[in-house]
Structure formats: C-alpha cells, structure tokens
C-alpha cells in the first residue's frame, strides 16, 4: 500500500545546543540533533526529562532560550507560522477534545496549511484524505463521529490528519501511547516506510519499539542528552540502569528485539 506523494521535498531540521527554561526551572540544556530523510529518529527517556519540550522546540511551538533550531540552514524563527506548518507536521501529546466531526472532516484539518484562507478543499485535498484513511486502516470506522471513537481509534485519526498534510518533516510525541500492540506496530511500520522521503522524529517510552525501529536513538535524562547512537549503542544495561534506576536488557530473538525489565 502506497501513500502518494504530491511533491517530494527533502529538508533537514537541526537543533544546535538548545537550552530552555520555564522561569528558573531548567528543562533542556545543550541538546542537539539533526533530522534528515532516510533515518527514523526516536527520542526516549523517563517522565519529566524534557522530551515533549524538545519536540515543541523543534516544531517552533516554543522558542529556545539559547541555541537555535535550523530548517535547511535558516533559523526557524524566520519562517511564518504558515510556512512552518507546510514544512513541519507536529503531533503533540496534548490532544484537543474529540468533537462531533466526521473522520474526513477531522482529517481535512490536517490539510489546512495547504489551503488559501476562505477557500474550499479541492479534489487533491479530498483525494489525500481518502488515501490516508485507507493507509491508516480507518475507512472501516464508517460514519462514526470522532467523539464516538475509542482513544486508540481517535489517535489513528490524528495520525492520519498529520499524514494528510504530507510535510517533509514530521514530529510525533507519543504517537503509539493509546494504541494496542498491533496498532502500535502498524504505525511504526508506516513511519519506517515514510522515512525515505520524510525526516521523522518521534517520542516513545516503549523501549522495544525504540530498539526495533530507531535508526538513531536519543536517550534524554534530566534535560540533557544522556546517550545517542544506534539502539545497540544506547540501550545498554549500564545506560538503562543509570537513567531508569532498574535492571533491564534488550534481548534479540527471531522476531526482533524485546526490552526485558528484571
């Protein structure tokens, strides 16, 4: 199953030595990363380590106190919010209430950055919505309204809305947290499929998914990058013990890696 690209635009997003604080409370210190098409970057770490703030800074939803975020070498602050929305798609962890929109209406909202103000969606927009509904396997939801869906079903609709925008960069904060194991696996397979033409970073607490799908894994702890590299380099027993305070190891079986906590 393919998700047709309207136009392939390859872009690079960089965070260089960024710092961020809420008042006197330091949230992130000296964090850097580079997102490019061809690799899936996964950010993980304990609760409160700054992962969501990192995503908000990368998407331009927050401004760093020091350092900078660069989009193809230009400071992200130099882009208008419409220009950013056409280039960077963000799925935040905080969700708006699921109101009584139809599935297609809610997914069409993901296309708004492409639409001139006060203009109706065109055939290409409607085609994109139909494509992502099939791609995400939610066409079977039928005529259900968003507020009639389960949390996991609605999460699939939100991911579909992000995919419908077809941005060259996607940032997703805990996209699989509300999904059952089969749904989480399917979504990660979709992100892996899209990475060849899309720069993708996502946050997850699931170390098994991180080990199985990450090309680059960033382990954040107390606002700092504790370790970065391949899953094998990052998810060592020593690193997991230091960051999470428990014993765990990544076991590799015939079906893939599994995080085992002891």
Q: What is the meaning of each model-derived region?
A:
Residues 13, 27-30:
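Conserved structural motif at the start of ABC-family nucleotide-binding domains
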Residues 44-46:
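The feature captures the beta-strand-to-loop junction immediately N-terminal to the Walker
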Residues 59:
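Helix-to-loop junction immediately C-terminal to a conserved catalytic motif
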Residues 67-75, 84:
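Conserved ABC transporter NBD signature motif
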Residues 119, 145-149, 153:
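Conserved ABC ATPase signature
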Residues 170-174:
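Catalytic Walker B motif of ABC-type/P-loop ATPase nucleotide-binding domains
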Residues 237, 242-262:
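ABC ATPase nucleotide-binding domains
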